Amino acid sequence: GQFQVRNIYLSVDPAQRGWANEGTNYAEPVALGGVMRALAVGVVVESRCPQVPEGIHLYGWFGWQQYAAVDQSALLWKVDLDIAHEGAWLGVLGLNGLTAWIGLKHLARAKPGETVIVTTAAGAVGGAVGQIAKACDLRAIGLTGDDGKAAVARAELGYAETINYRSATDLSAAVAASA
């Protein structure tokens, strides 16, 4: 069965720029005039699938469009509005947050009291890493490309220190001094 989702929030991600180019990429390019691939949070407004009732909120690859026709075989996640607002499912509770968590806890295996250094500290994944690091009693040093982003990373994203890699005369020395 199929169902129709009305998108409420759409993701805008750096990868989408690459998908707009013709040629070799890790994913098929989006055709000119086609619907841009994107994760979205939406509400089911019509359903011909008993497992997916109308009114339920979902997170999935619905694309940049107001409405998406979705097959029941699509990879979807139910959005629990008791946990967080719909928009959070595109950020810290979605793919960016999952990427941050896996990178920090499962790949880096960072332990409380350790220091981690994060590139693109003010980006979607880097911002989530900073917050998770702080919650896990890690000291996070963030690399950013300008002083405004550095200030946001310190004030809002959990970073103990930040380094503007564009203005640092010796990045290695700046990192060593911060660590």
Regions found by a protein language model. Give the residues of each.
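NAD(P)H dinucleotide-binding glycine-rich loop of Rossmann-like/cofactor-binding domains
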Residues: 36-43, 51-120
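Adenosine-nucleotide cofactor-binding segment
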Residues: 134-179
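Gly/Ala-rich phosphate-binding loop of Rossmann-like dinucleotide-binding domains
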Residues: 100, 130, 134
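Alpha-helical segments flanking ligand/cofactor-binding loops in enzyme cores
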Residues: 5, 53, 130-131, 151
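Glycine-rich beta-strand-centered segment in the early N-terminal region that forms part
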Residues: 1-12, 20-64
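N-terminal Rossmann-fold NAD(P) dinucleotide-binding loop
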Residues: 126-127
